[in-house]
Curated annotation (Swiss-Prot):
Family of the protein in this entry: Belongs to the universal ribosomal protein uL22 family.
Organism: Xanthomonas campestris pv. campestris (strain ATCC 33913 / DSM 3586 / NCPPB 528 / LMG 568 / P 25)
Gene of this entry: rplV
GO molecular-function term, one example from the UniProt record: structural constituent of ribosome
Protein's name in the database: Large ribosomal subunit protein uL22
Tree of life domain: Bacteria
Any one GO CC term of the record: cytosolic large ribosomal subunit
Keyword RNA-binding: yes
GO terms, biological process: translation
PROSITE patterns the UniProt entry points to: RIBOSOMAL_L22
Pfam families, A to Z: Ribosomal_L22
InterPro entries: Ribosomal_uL22, Ribosomal_uL22_bac/chlpt-type, Ribosomal_uL22_bac/org-type, Ribosomal_uL22_CS, Ribosomal_uL22_sf
Amino acid sequence: MTMEAKAILRTARISPQKARLVADQVRGLSAERAVNLLKFSDKKAAHLIKKVVESAIANAENNQGADVDELKVKTIMVDEGPSLKRFMARAKGRGTRILKRTSHITVVVGAAK
């Protein structure tokens, strides 16, 4: 049986396209290295993903007694959440719909073999 722990952040107020740029950088890294990389990134998505990775590490440590030094980011997925529909006034009495996109961020950490 493989030891894995998971953490999910739902309806994060960031577009999936922007969040995937950061997620691709930490996929497959050791958990400690991933947190360090995210800590020094100035992107908004990095802060959100760092919190989810730290939560997954804490889940592995507390629920399954895993050694934090042996954990790595096995999978990280950014799926599209519900969009907030907003209205922007345009010329000649018209209006345009704006989509404020949200993301579901899922992180699975497990023991590196």
